[in-house]
């Protein structure tokens, strides 16, 4: 699941002389079939065996392993927000922006939802009953469904498809979007945008 992203990241790291550390559930003595080996050993510098973790039931909604009816999206979204360490934007300003931006949506639009305030656009699309008339996407590879807000942003509830991030950006770069709502770290009065670095923080992804 989403294994292509892991390969793309490993290839990029090695191409830039970085070190690749792979986290796995377990080590095995019997080699996998070649077609099942997503990351070749020559790209791996170290392996870490992860300790078993207790999994919250709410996160099952994000696996894509079972279908979630449209009528249950609200219920699952609320469950996920309750267990999220990072709460979604819910300020007056964020809601005003999100509500206004959602009015730009048209039937059959393919839409990219960015992190931060753009998450509110998805919420207002849901409240207005437009979710089943448009296709929401997120950069991490989810298409269709409803983007999860807060800590788990990047995942989708009720996704129609989940594929690799590189394929998602192929869709974006080739003009497959009708509208895109993006967040920003800083914006000045002239509309210049800083999406890379803030005070006392690591460089953002831009």
Model-identified regions with their sequence ranges:
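N-terminal active-site beta-alpha-beta segment that forms phosphate/nucleotide-binding
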Residues: 79-165
């Amino acid at each position: 699941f989403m294994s292509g992203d892991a390969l793309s990241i490993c290839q990029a790291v090695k191409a830039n002389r970085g070190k690749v550390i792979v986290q796995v559930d377990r080590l095995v003595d019997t080699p996998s079939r070649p077609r099942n080996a997503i990351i070749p050993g020559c790209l791996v510098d170290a392996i870490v065996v992860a300790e078993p973790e207790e999994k919250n039931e709410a996160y099952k909604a994000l696996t894509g392993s079972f279908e979630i009816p449209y009528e249950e999206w609200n219920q699952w979204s609320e469950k996920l927000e309750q267990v999220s360490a990072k709460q979604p934007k819910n300020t007056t300003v964020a809601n005003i922006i999100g509500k206004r931006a959602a009015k730009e949506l048209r039937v059959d639009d393919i839409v990219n939802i960015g992190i931060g305030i753009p998450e509110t656009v998805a919420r207002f699309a849901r409240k207005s009953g437009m979710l089943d008339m448009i296709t929401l996407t997120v950069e991490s590879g989810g298409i269709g469904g409803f983007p999860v807000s807060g800590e788990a942003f990047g995942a989708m509830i009720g996704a129609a498809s989940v594929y690799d991030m590189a394929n998602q950006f192929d869709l974006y770069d080739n003009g497959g979007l009708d509208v895109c709502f993006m967040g920003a770290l800083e914006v000045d009065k002239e509309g210049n945008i800083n999406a890379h670095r803030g005070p006392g923080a690591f460089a953002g992804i831009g």
